[in-house]
């Protein structure tokens, strides 16, 4: 699910990242939503996504980075793979209690001859350099570049507290994350508590708590008055 609210200046990335024709969240949808937002007001991007297309994620990151207003990120349950990269655009990055983040090296499915496959590998290397720089900007002073690259190679999962400790998030939000179940085999090291067995090709279903989080956001705005 992708949605946005111009009244609260919130954007909800509650699905996989990828082509809109496949029912996923694409960069065009995000850019269209940003144009409707107050240009001088802070925007909150609420994430509950297992990731997806790195191409779309880079385009979404760039669109958010170009937005003239301040961009903050709230991880409502999970930000894995490409979604964790998008999260790095936030001036602040909060994560709900029980929420998780995952970072890993980008991968893809490709077909072609040896020359074409080498070109694909080169593109993946470029993407890895780009996302490594984004993570490193947050984790600098805590981990060396080689350690960060190893986190990516190992497919590293972080609890909410671990994400803050690592520098990937700025604070833990005092709400309980809704659990999300990830299809078995989607990632190499998915924590067992998140694994659900699904038929081949079946997509992960994300809990859609839009109204709940919108109410929380409105309450937070009221409390600041």
For the regions a protein language model found, what residue spans apply to each?
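N-terminal organellar transit peptides
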Residues: 1-82, 89-225
């Amino acid at each position: 699910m992708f949605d946005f609210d111009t009244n609260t200046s919130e954007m909800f990335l509650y699905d996989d990242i990828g082509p809109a024709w496949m029912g996923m969240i694409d960069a065009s949808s995000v850019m269209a939503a940003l144009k409707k937002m107050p240009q001088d007001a802070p925007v909150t991007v609420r994430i509950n996504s297992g990731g997806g297309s790195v191409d779309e994620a880079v385009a979404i990151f760039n669109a958010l980075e170009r937005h003239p207003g301040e961009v903050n990120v709230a991880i409502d349950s999970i930000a894995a793979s490409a979604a964790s990269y998008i999260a790095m655009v936030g001036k602040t990055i909060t994560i709900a209690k029980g929420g998780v983040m995952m970072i890993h090296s980008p991968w893809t499915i490709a077909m072609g001859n040896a020359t074409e496959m080498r070109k694909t590998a080169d593109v993946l290397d470029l993407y890895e350099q780009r996302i490594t720089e984004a993570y490193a900007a947050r984790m600098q002073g805590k981990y060396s570049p080689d350690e960060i690259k190893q986190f990516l190679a190992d497919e590293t999962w972080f609890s909410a507290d671990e994400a803050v400790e690592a520098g990937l998030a700025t604070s833990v939000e005092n709400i309980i994350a809704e659990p999300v179940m990830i299809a078995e085999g989607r990632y190499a090291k998915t924590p067992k508590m998140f694994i659900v067995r699904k038929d081949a090709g079946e997509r992960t279903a994300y809990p859609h708590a839009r109204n709940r989080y919108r109410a929380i956001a409105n309450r937070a705005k009221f409390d600041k008055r």
